[in-house]
Curated annotation (Swiss-Prot):
Primary localization: host cell
Superkingdom of origin organism: Viruses
Topology of this chain in the membrane: Multi-pass membrane protein
Cellular component terms per the entry's GO annotation: host cell membrane; membrane
UniProt feature coiled coil, ranges: none
Organism name: Human herpesvirus 6B (strain Z29) (HHV-6 variant B)
This protein's UniProt keywords: Host membrane, Membrane, Transmembrane, Transmembrane helix
Lineage: Viruses, Duplodnaviria, Heunggongvirae, Peploviricota, Herviviricetes
Membrane-spanning parts: 5-25, 172-192
Name this polypeptide is given: Protein U22
Length: 202
């Protein structure tokens, strides 16, 4: 007779080991997720560091129009910590930490950046920009450094390639695998949970 707690442990091991691996595969193939409008050039591209393995950093990207209500649209990522003022006078509140970088996309290379004391930016380094250039965006960018020299805003002219998400058939395969594993887990869990009852009737 199988102990009743065994099935729960088996299901837990399955989900901890197998299901996250599917998400990791999915992240590696669709690490840059976002949109860029052909008619609306003023966007914030937010790069969120997802994972790092073998010295390679993977970043997830979201895109928000600059005239959108910033805190409402991406409140789950940011708390206001600094103010970025564009050349047209728009002020955007944003937050920086070691896992988040911000690229200002505009056809105007002038902007003013101000920070409260103690706030330090995580710079988007050359390798990240090269990754953007080769994998997702065709980017020509310029750097604007503040007078204090502690940060820069990358001003980019971007053309979004059509490779945004996993191909439909790959997403279907991952979906089928997930459903199959879930069904197996439920079946085995029910089987081992009812095993003592079957033995009692026997």
């Amino acid at each position: 007779m199988v102990p009743q707690g065994w099935s729960l442990a088996w299901v837990s091991v399955l989900y901890v080991s197998v299901i996250p691996s599917l998400h990791i595969i999915n992240n590696e193939n669709s690490v840059f997720i976002g949109t860029h409008s052909e008619t609306e050039l003023r966007h914030w591209l937010i790069f969120v560091k997802m994972a790092q393995r073998s010295g390679t950093a993977w970043w997830r990207m979201a895109s928000v129009p600059i005239n959108a209500y910033f805190e409402r649209d991406i409140a789950f990522l940011f708390n206001p910590r600094c103010v970025i003022e564009t050349a047209l006078g728009s002020k955007i509140l944003c937050r920086y930490n070691k896992n988040i970088g911000v690229v200002f996309v505009d056809n105007d290379t002038t902007c003013n950046v101000s920070f409260p004391s103690g706030v330090q930016l995580q710079l988007l380094n050359q390798s990240v920009m090269e990754s953007i250039r080769t994998k997702t965006y065709v980017v020509d960018y310029a750097r604007k450094t503040t007078e204090r020299g502690d940060c820069f805003i990358s001003v980019a002219f971007c053309r979004k390639e059509r490779r945004r998400f996993l191909p439909r058939y790959e997403r279907f395969v991952y979906y089928c695998i997930s459903v199959y594993l879930f069904a197996v887990a439920v079946f085995c869990s029910c089987w081992f949970a009812l095993d003592p009852l079957f033995n009692m009737w026997a």
